[in-house]
Amino acid sequence: MVNVPKTRRTFCKKCGKHQPHKVTQYKKGKDSLYAQGKRRYDRKQSGYGGQTKPIFRKKAKTTKKIVLRLECVEPNCRSKRMLAIKRCKHFELGGDKKRKVCYAWKVQPCL
């Protein structure tokens, strides 16, 4: 499981220095009905003759790459940028940090 904090101090290109950034997970927007490929597809599909293009069924990957959206918290800046991280099955944003478990019968003290 990947746990990412909700804020991160990192370089802002617009400010030109390290600033705190608000971290959110990128989500794909709604597909446009007026993109050239969609217009062509809809035109081809209309009328008689069933499905005209192959429907993709051989999915290879079980995970997606996680993309973080970093937004500068400076009120005058608010610039946004994307940061891709590795693939993972479980992604968590701002979850609880792992704590070291301390048992009473251990000789060394826990730090």
Swiss-Prot record:
UniProt cross-references to InterPro entries, sorted A to Z: Ribosomal_eL44 (IPR000552), Ribosomal_LSU_eL42 (IPR053708), Ribosomal_zn-bd (IPR011332)
GO cellular component: cytosol; ribonucleoprotein complex; ribosome
Keyword Ribonucleoprotein: yes
BP terms from Gene Ontology: translation
Any one GO MF annotation of this record: structural constituent of ribosome
Amino acids binding Zn(2+): 12, 15, 72, 77
Keywords for this protein: Cytoplasm, Ribonucleoprotein, Ribosomal protein, Zinc
Cited Pfam families: Ribosomal_L44 (PF00935)
Subcellular location: Cytoplasm
Role noted for this protein: Component of the large ribosomal subunit. The ribosome is a large ribonucleoprotein complex responsible for the synthesis of proteins in the cell.
Family (UniProt): Belongs to the eukaryotic ribosomal protein eL42 family.
Assembly with partners or alone: Component of the large ribosomal subunit.
Protein name: Large ribosomal subunit protein eL42
Native species: Oryctolagus cuniculus (Rabbit)
